[in-house]
Amino acid sequence: MGPRATTICSLFFLLWVLAEPAENSDFYLPGDYLLGGLFSLHANMKGIVHLNFLQVPMCKEYEVKVIGYNLMQDMRFSVEEINNDSSLLPGVLLGYEMVDVCYVSNNVQPVLYFLAHEDNLLPIQEDYSDYVSRVVAVIGPDNSESVMTVANFLSLFLLPQITYSAISDELRDKVRFPALLRTTPSADHHIEAMVQLMLHFRWNWIIVLVSSDTYGRDNGQLLGERLARRDICIAFQETLPTLQPNQNMTSEERQRLVTIVDKLQQSTARVVVVFSPDLTLYDFFNEVLRQNFTGAVWIASESWAIDPVLHNLTELRHTGTFLGITIQSVPIPGFSEFRERDSQAGPPPLGKTSQRSTCNQECDNCLNATLSFNTILRLSGERVVYSVYSAVYAVAHALHSLLGCDHSTCTKRVVYPWQLLEEIWKVNFTLLDHQIFFDPQGDMALHLEIVQWQWDRSQNPFQSVASYHPLQRQLKNIQDISWHTINNTIPVSMCSKRCQSGQKKKPVGIHVCCFECIDCLPGTFLNHTEDEYECQACPSNEWSYQSETSCFKRQLAFLEWHEAPTIAVALLAALGFLSTLAILVIFWRHFQTPMVRSAGGPMCFLMLTLLLVAYMVVPVYVGPPKVSTCLCRQALFPLCFTICISCIAVRSFQIICAFKMASRFPRAYSYWVRYQGPYVSMAFITVLKMVIVVIGMLATGLNPTTRTDPDDPKIMIVSCNPNYRNSLLFNTSLDLLLSVVGFSFANMGKELPTNYNEAKFITLSMTFYFTSSISLCTFMSAYSGVLVTIVDLLVTVLNLLAISLGYFGPKCYMILFYPERNTPAYFNSVIQGYTMTRD
């Protein structure tokens, strides 16, 4: 025996204990093809009491559920409208048989009844492909747990089942439920609409209340997972106590409600999401009213979002703003009149029996209860009824296709459940300006709406304030909401206020929504899209002020021609160049005179030429550094300057040799003269300087670099050498040594003849260079700002002037103004006088 047969046998006994109470015309209408309807006409909570007894609960023992009865009336209206339509199913009469499923175990008996034959027998067969059940399709039930129970039976027969309000995502599994479809969006869309509502109003600190049944647990878990991905935190989540059937609330359950409302009072969260059947909420909201809890935003799940009985607790208006997620409102022409006409007709007569009846087809108080809520049902826009309406029409259109109907006739024949199911999957038609079709998961893409509860009798009690489109997964058409706050301000529900621009979050506690706001320091910025908890450092060429979300390009600082210090130094350099050029011309014209020859002769022209080149290198200090300008700064100028100083040092040594060492060390002096000692020395010094320059360039490179101005971080100083201070000491070490040597030899020759006594001029030049270089290094060790470049250039020009004017200036002065002292006779007399004095 297969698993299907085993399942059927285990429940076969129930088919023989079916009661036959009085028939009510609301529940049964004969026809060529019957639709089964499962509606909750009485309110009862899931419990365990009736599961201990082998009997079906009697729904009439519980309170009437107005919405359920209203939905049942809509199915009656839909079938009647289809039967009156001469084009949809011409010549075919559609009937129905509906059952009240107020309790979880009530679903088993009706589904077996729907599957059985007219004689209440359900045969055990190996193949049900050609089996014809009592009904061709089932509409309902309303909640996910009951739908799964029914679907597990109907799926064995592939009997079409269309639910109108069950939203569980489990129902999308077509492997488990191949015959199940629904005319309402899934829980995924309901939760997404809630989350987008919270995001729109920037609520990130909420409270979640759930019922203890599967509906509450599953939706609470789904909401928690969705909120975690959107950085919305749950302050706390509580489970509402669930009453057992026909039982009063116990003291423990009462205390539980008191504790929950106390936590609501103490919490800083002001948005409360409630997933629960409506009956559980009556005692809860009464406790809320008793403790005078106000100022909340209540977000209702679809199970109670448009419940007229809860809305009838008018004092709830003082507890805050009520928003609910529900199906879109689609007015059905004529339905309100149909319901009111049916209510005015009064209850059906009792005592009428029928062998077709099953149990729980009674609702003596439904008409009176519906009549008392008729106004609110009419004003609310008949929301969920369209889901039932479209479900019935989907079956009718499938029958239209299956029976080969045209505008006048249909071919009546046996309809097998699996055939009708295939046609239902294919339906695609327009109903009241809405396209009706099922996606691959069996869902219908109807819009959801956010409704606000209103208690003004002249207004819709469930006023639409926004709409959610499942296909776009987007909240649209958000309208103004009447907030129950001072000055109608939007309620704030945040653990921590939103940080201002440029502030990072410092977590406080375990919730990501609770944090402190700390300003980002200068030089850092906050990238909200990457990390809200750490400020990122700006790139090296950018900067930011405090509390910034982006960095800006640092201003590049270098010497520019329009700046006053640059102009002043350029004028000094021009003066030095012109004066050096003039000295060169004077020396050229008086090349054969003793004054020029005593100053060094050809060596003077080498020095003057190098000085002119050094002056011409000065402009490379101005403007943005480049590889070529850096090469001139680090190689050409130091080399020129070193050769000049080496010439002075060698010239001083040569004079000392001529007057003091020639007589003492004649052999050494002869070698010095024979092998061109001055030029060999200068060549050696030049090569040594070139080695120093090459080593410096290899160590630091020629590419321009930038460094931050210590006085103003938004400025980047562009320079040729990142370690200019260290490289300056390295490059000038030889020059400083030569200046000391030149100074020493000049000091040794202070007793020489006047025309050869250059001690005071060399001392002036070398002392100035030595002092300025040491001062520059000292200045750079204490300061590294933008003034370094201009001070370096100024010292460079002054050192050049010290040689040009300090060393060559006095000689030009003697040549021009004392020509009588620039004769061989005068020089010889001076030398003879020096010799006689030494003797």
Swiss-Prot record:
GO cellular component: plasma membrane; sweet taste receptor complex
Annotated signal sequence range: 1-19
Domain of life of the source: Eukaryota
Keyword vocabulary terms for this entry: Cell membrane, G-protein coupled receptor, Glycoprotein, Membrane, Receptor, Sensory transduction, Signal, Taste, Transducer, Transmembrane, Transmembrane helix
Compartment annotation: Cell membrane
Protein's recorded name: Taste receptor type 1 member 2
UniProt gene name: TAS1R2
Glycosylation (residues): N84, N248, N292, N312, N368, N428, N487, N527
Extracellular side of membrane: 20-566, 624-635, 703-727, 782-784
Transmembrane segments: 567-587, 603-623, 636-656, 682-702, 728-748, 761-781, 785-805
Protein's membrane topology: Multi-pass membrane protein
InterPro entries xrefs: ANF_lig-bd_rcpt, GPCR_3, GPCR_3_9-Cys_dom, GPCR_3_9-Cys_sf, GPCR_3_C, GPCR_3_Ca_sens_rcpt-rel, GPCR_3_CS, Peripla_BP_I
Keyword Lyase carried by entry: no
Family: Belongs to the G-protein coupled receptor 3 family. TAS1R subfamily.
Segments on the Cytoplasmic side according to the record's topology features: 588-602, 657-681, 749-760, 806-839
Alphabetized PROSITE patterns for the sequence: G_PROTEIN_RECEP_F3_2, G_PROTEIN_RECEP_F3_4
Protein's job: Putative taste receptor. TAS1R2/TAS1R3 recognizes diverse natural and synthetic sweeteners.
GO MF, one example: G protein-coupled receptor activity
Assembly and binders: Forms heterodimers with TAS1R3.
Main location: membrane
Keyword Chaperone: no
